[in-house]
Amino acid sequence: MSKQQRRNFLKTIGTAGLGSLLAPNFLAQTSDDKIFKSEDVDLHEAKRKNGVLTLQLLQTTDVHCQIFPHDELFWENDKAVFRKTGGYAELQTFLKQLKKKNPNTFLVDTGDMFQGSQLSVETTGQAFVPILNAMDYHLYLPGNWEVIYGKQKMQQLMGALRAPKVCTNMYHDLGNGQKGELIFQPYQIWEHEGIKIGFLGYTDPLVPLRQSPNYSKGIIYTKPEENLAHYIDVLRNQEQCAVVIMLAHLGLSQQIALANDPSCKGVDYIFGGDTHERVRKPIQCAYSKVVEPGAFGSFVGSLELDFENGKLTAERYELLEVKAPSLKPDAQMQAILKSNEATFAAEINRVVGYSTIPLYRYFVVENPIDTMILNALDWKFPEIDIVLSNGFRFCPPRTTPDHTGNIPITKGFIFDMLPVDSTVRTAEVTGQQIADWLEKELNNVFAKDASKRFGGWVIKFKGMEVDFLAYAEQGMRVQKAIVGGQPLDKTKTYSILACERDGDPADMLCRIKGVKNAQNTVHTLHKVMESYLTTHKVVTPTPQGNAKVLDAPQTLLTQVTGVSYEFK
């Protein structure tokens, strides 16, 4: 963002917006008048029927800075269908409707609220502070991407949000591996008419490995098992909470594994995030139930709890779709969105190319979005044997044609696909390194032990063809690997290309250790994408089967197994 653009942006958010950016992060009180802010209801009037008090807990997660309605993919009758969902103004209207029906409502967001769009990058997340504050959330959990602008900026952004923040496993790093105090408060209690609901929060402890290490420099993460039992005891026995909810940004597999661990005994529900899974029926595990409400503001998770004489007597969970066409945008929120984006709108909406097919990133193995990225890299660097791209999950679909009959790809959509404009980096590796790396990457996605699953979907590649068994034993998944039309030669040296990760060792590329002759190019991912699209004008990025799963459908939509769950 240029200095002039920044000045213009700061003018648009106004004095109130700046105040919220600089507001200190005080611990919120738990009385009703501090929790509820809706002007539409009598805050002291309980929703009762036949002596039953119903409390409603609402959750959003992984919105990834998608401020306007967008195309969304649904899997129905074994095929992809698309509908318009989300948008903060539409979401605000929807939430107000839910709060009006039941004023006894507590709204949480479980992370990835400051990363995922061009507007976020241009303003280093600041544009989203007034948006989130206007949404009247009651509690936040930082996600794995809240550190994208560094620790200090994360603290400033989270601290500018008026509602409290909870995270029970992020500590200040005092140096030499010494752990300091918690960065955020460890728990929060909502008390309503004598009923206490306690909230804990755990974000992904693997952030320093999953993302560029320098993003989370200065932070020590711990596994939930290290202090979970202690804080459950505090909430259950000291604070006498009737219900304990864990806010989590660990991924559905990890959340299920945790809910089956004895340390989780005493947690009623895990409100999960990170993997963008859509849990429509709570997953019952040994000690807790697990839910996760999708991503991009397309859904709201709703848990209703009935109490009689202070005792929990019934519970109901729904995954609610935010159907944008049927929701009138909230006028106040719409004004905030348009004002905050005004300085950058022309560039965000600038069309750089077109696709003839829908663009999405929901399949575990291969997707059109990733195919387009790989095609662009391969076009720019034809001399490289294998081009690689991370198995990212974020980015909503883009499926709506314009007047040309094709689907426009804007500059803003490039940011949606690739929020970090990383430098393109090349290196050399042996066939043995590739073979070992492939097995490790596949185990990260499909490990039988859910607690060992790590990161996003299957790594994406072009120049190499791999057939694999998703559910084979570790180290035995790859059945065939071909590079340049020939079987992978473990003694041969191959050239590879991927994105640079800030803070990685000089001899590491795309999590492959010990690479040789690694060097940065003069190109970034965004420059390559824009050059490719403006040159080709119209593309058809159909996946070519570079990765083929032999024991599951190529349209696999989740890495979760062993429980009653399907993505749809």
Residue ranges, per PLM feature:
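Catalytic centers of hydrolytic enzymes
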Residues: 36, 44-94, 100, 129, ...
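Acidic, metal/ion-coordinating pockets
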Residues: 2, 6-323, 364, 368-376, ...
